[in-house]
Amino acid sequence: MSDIIHLLPDSVANQIAAGEVIQRPASVIKELVENAIDADAQNIHVLVTDAGKTCIQIIDDGKGMSETDARLSFERHATSKIREAADLFALRTMGFRGEALASIAAVAQVELKTRLESEELGTKLVIAGSKVESQEAVSCSKGSNFSVKNLFFNVPARRKFLKANSTELSNILAEFERIALVHPEVAFSLYSNDSELFNLPVSPLRQRILAIFGKKLNQQLLNIEVNTTMVKISGYIAKPETARKKGAHQYFFVNGRYMRHPYFHKAVMEAYEQLIPVGEQVSYFIYFEVDPANIDVNIHPTKTEIKFENEQAIWQILSASVKESLGKFSAIPSIDFDTEDMPDIPAFEQNLPPAPPKIHYNSDFNPFKVSSGGSGGGSYSRPKVEWEGLYGGLTKASKMNEPQQEPEMDWENSPFEEEPMVAEEKTISAVSAASSTFSSASSTLYANESVIEKGNLHLQFKGRFILTSVKSGLMLIDQHRAHIRVLFDRYMVQIKQKQGVSQGVLFPEILQLPASEAAVLQGIMDDLSAVGFDLSDLGGGSYAINGIPSGIEGLNPVELVRNMLHTAMEKGNDVKEEIQNILALTLARAAAIVYGQVLSNEEMVSLVDSLFACPSPNYTPDGKTVLTTIKEEDIEKLFK
């Protein structure tokens, strides 16, 4: 048998390695911008065309490279950052593996212009698919100028799986923001299709945060700072009242590097546990400075997962520092020991006999004396109760749900026996008792009519469930979830057919977004318009909401659009279909009948019929149970 194992060509090996390092255009920008920072650049310009699919250009004023270094930098594992394994535990640079440039050159057409400050001429290098096409001297500025064109041109399968331009641009902006947040001492700019998205001058950290996410955040940030022999923690956390379900800006950085750390995230959120609703999040920008020997950066290709040697101790320090910051800025309830506004407490002399308290009273008052003239006397007459007024609103409300002609109810021969009331139930107010009686009578009446006319029983239980008999037993239907199921299917048809009805607003709402979110919003504008939203771009990340879908007048349109936007950013794949589902579900939840709403028999019948006309009546779009059936044999067992 002949030998079957052989070495792969460098070009193939580089393409395989690129699959880990270069996943999308944002990965290219991350690697090249980090290289520029390692080269001590003070100004970095990023230019992208078609969300980086056509061209990515990174221009910096860093140290630059010599002719030899420029050629060698595209070889695998060629780096200036480390020389031996021990250097991995003393890293102060962003890159160190020497894989990025080789991986980029393996799947794109790359042109590099670079010059050292001490040299008059620079070097121009052209590489495509790991093959050097040309290298020549050129006149250029100090630093480096990378141009990456036609990403994945030789890997069609990878290029085919790139997402929509809006999604890829959002990923680029996210990477750009992470780097800009950790290096406020560097000036950055970002252009997309010749449009300026960011122009960030050198500034303090707080100003850099506001420049990226908006000045509105300024009033929401609390300072956090603690310095120990193990770790130095600094940055900002948001006030509890700014919590939201989606869209919180949450960033951890360690030694100038962005990282994801679920364990430390729990430490931050634990401090907010009693201050914000369950399931909501707050923004934070937290920076760690740790001895490089106590962390391991080299455990993930993207270097975003970092292992700490003293993880549990740092968790405790982080949680305590967040709590301290919240308490210091009065973000949590605290005991006030300020005595400035306290009442004066008199000092009593000792050895004095106790004296009875002085009580002021009217010695001429006689409760049994009959008053004359009906005024100023001591008798008390109970005010007349206007009983009709108590039931006025109830009568009007009752008539709205009643049929045109209400038959007489035979109370004496009613088939239902009155349950004995316990003592606690008798304490209910007269109005509530009357309301319950009217509701019960109305439901009983409709039930009897249903039995007579259709032979099927529809009852409402606790203002939440609809009870109806089926062949196998008794079916319980959650009225709120059932209505969501029905409305969701209707809205989905409208969205897909672009038949959404828009209702104009008297005063347009203004939605202010950072650049990364604005890029995603541009990609889903058509889907928003299809369901009835009318948005206009005011520039600078500001959008005016001029119209909203009919039926959601009670909701905050800004928060509604923001929630759908953040969900689209999280999903990434199949954005259009996902947004359609989100829109339909959100609108269905907003317009659905609520728990406690009394339904007439006709309304219950209509809802049940509409539910079973749906393709999937058993569950809501988000997987919650709509109905359940109690089998007849199970009911019979209860009476054995």
From Swiss-Prot:
Q: Which InterPro entries match?
A: DNA_mismatch_repair_CS (IPR014762), DNA_mismatch_repair_MutL (IPR020667), DNA_mismatch_S5_2-like (IPR013507), HATPase_C_sf (IPR036890), MutL/Mlh/PMS (IPR002099), MutL/Mlh/Pms-like (IPR038973), MutL_C (IPR014790), MutL_C_dimsub (IPR042120)
Query: Which is one Gene Ontology cellular component term of this protein?
Result: mismatch repair complex
Q: Name one GO molecular function term.
A: ATP-dependent DNA damage sensor activity
Under the heading PROSITE patterns, the entry gives: DNA_MISMATCH_REPAIR_1
Classification via CDD domains: HATPase_MutL-MLH-PMS-like (cd16926), MutL_Trans (cd00782)
- SMART domains found in the cross-reference section: DNA_mis_repair, MutL_C
Q: Which domain of life is it from?
A: Bacteria
**UniProt keyword annotation of Zinc-finger present:** no
Example GO biological process: mismatch repair
The record's section on PANTHER family has: DNA MISMATCH REPAIR PROTEIN MLH, PMS, MUTL, DNA MISMATCH REPAIR PROTEIN MLH1
Q: Please give the function described in this protein's UniProt entry.
A: This protein is involved in the repair of mismatches in DNA. It is required for dam-dependent methyl-directed DNA mismatch repair. May act as a 'molecular matchmaker', a protein that promotes the formation of a stable complex between two or more DNA-binding proteins in an ATP-dependent manner without itself being part of a final effector complex.
Similarity comment text for this entry: Belongs to the DNA mismatch repair MutL/HexB family.
Name of the protein this chain belongs to: DNA mismatch repair protein MutL
Query: Which species is this record about?
Result: Bacteroides thetaiotaomicron (strain ATCC 29148 / DSM 2079 / JCM 5827 / CCUG 10774 / NCTC 10582 / VPI-5482 / E50)
The organism's lineage? Bacteria, Pseudomonadati, Bacteroidota, Bacteroidia, Bacteroidales
Q: Which gene encodes it?
A: mutL
